[in-house]
Design a protein with these regions (language model features):
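A domain-level signal for the structural core that forms small-molecule/cofactor-binding pockets
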Residues: 1-82
Length: 82
Protein backbone atom coordinates (compact mmCIF):
# COMPACT_ATOMS: atom_id res chain seq x y z
CA UNK A 1 0.00 0.00 0.00
CA UNK A 2 2.81 2.43 0.87
CA UNK A 3 4.46 1.79 -2.51
CA UNK A 4 1.20 2.61 -4.29
CA UNK A 5 0.91 5.88 -2.38
CA UNK A 6 4.52 6.77 -3.15
CA UNK A 7 4.04 5.98 -6.84
CA UNK A 8 0.89 8.13 -6.92
CA UNK A 9 2.67 11.08 -5.29
CA UNK A 10 5.53 10.78 -7.79
CA UNK A 11 3.05 10.64 -10.67
CA UNK A 12 1.23 13.76 -9.47
CA UNK A 13 4.49 15.62 -8.77
CA UNK A 14 5.75 14.75 -12.26
CA UNK A 15 2.54 16.08 -13.82
CA UNK A 16 3.10 19.36 -11.97
CA UNK A 17 6.75 19.32 -13.03
CA UNK A 18 5.86 18.76 -16.68
CA UNK A 19 3.44 21.66 -16.63
CA UNK A 20 5.80 24.18 -15.05
CA UNK A 21 8.80 23.00 -17.06
CA UNK A 22 6.80 23.67 -20.24
CA UNK A 23 5.84 27.12 -18.93
CA UNK A 24 9.50 28.08 -18.36
CA UNK A 25 11.54 25.88 -20.73
CA UNK A 26 14.60 28.15 -20.61
CA UNK A 27 14.44 29.02 -16.90
CA UNK A 28 14.84 25.99 -14.65
CA UNK A 29 15.00 28.23 -11.57
CA UNK A 30 11.57 29.68 -12.26
CA UNK A 31 10.19 26.21 -12.93
CA UNK A 32 11.54 24.76 -9.67
CA UNK A 33 10.19 27.72 -7.73
CA UNK A 34 6.76 27.34 -9.35
CA UNK A 35 6.72 23.59 -8.65
CA UNK A 36 7.55 24.16 -4.99
CA UNK A 37 4.97 26.94 -4.69
CA UNK A 38 2.29 24.70 -6.20
CA UNK A 39 3.12 21.82 -3.85
CA UNK A 40 3.09 24.18 -0.87
CA UNK A 41 -0.24 25.75 -1.87
CA UNK A 42 -2.21 22.73 -3.03
CA UNK A 43 -0.77 19.63 -1.36
CA UNK A 44 -1.59 18.66 2.22
CA UNK A 45 1.43 18.81 4.53
CA UNK A 46 1.24 15.03 4.96
CA UNK A 47 1.61 14.57 1.19
CA UNK A 48 4.64 16.87 1.03
CA UNK A 49 6.25 15.15 4.01
CA UNK A 50 5.69 11.71 2.49
CA UNK A 51 7.14 12.76 -0.86
CA UNK A 52 10.22 14.24 0.84
CA UNK A 53 10.67 11.10 2.99
CA UNK A 54 10.44 8.86 -0.06
CA UNK A 55 12.82 11.15 -1.96
CA UNK A 56 15.34 11.09 0.90
CA UNK A 57 15.08 7.29 1.11
CA UNK A 58 15.75 6.88 -2.61
CA UNK A 59 12.26 5.53 -3.26
CA UNK A 60 11.45 7.97 -6.08
CA UNK A 61 13.57 6.82 -9.04
CA UNK A 62 10.90 7.91 -11.53
CA UNK A 63 10.78 11.48 -10.21
CA UNK A 64 11.59 14.01 -12.94
CA UNK A 65 14.93 15.80 -12.42
CA UNK A 66 13.18 19.20 -12.35
CA UNK A 67 10.92 17.99 -9.51
CA UNK A 68 13.88 16.52 -7.63
CA UNK A 69 15.62 19.87 -8.01
CA UNK A 70 12.55 21.66 -6.63
CA UNK A 71 12.50 19.34 -3.60
CA UNK A 72 16.19 19.96 -2.92
CA UNK A 73 16.14 23.71 -3.54
CA UNK A 74 12.92 24.53 -1.72
CA UNK A 75 12.86 21.88 1.00
CA UNK A 76 12.46 24.35 3.87
CA UNK A 77 9.41 25.92 2.21
CA UNK A 78 7.80 22.55 1.63
CA UNK A 79 8.06 21.41 5.24
CA UNK A 80 5.26 22.56 7.54
CA UNK A 81 6.13 25.08 10.23
CA UNK A 82 7.08 23.40 13.52
Amino acid sequence: MEHDQSAQLVKMANQIGSFFQAQSPSDAGAATQAIAAHLKSFWAPSMRIQLLRDFDAGKTPLLMPIVASALRSHRSTLLPAP
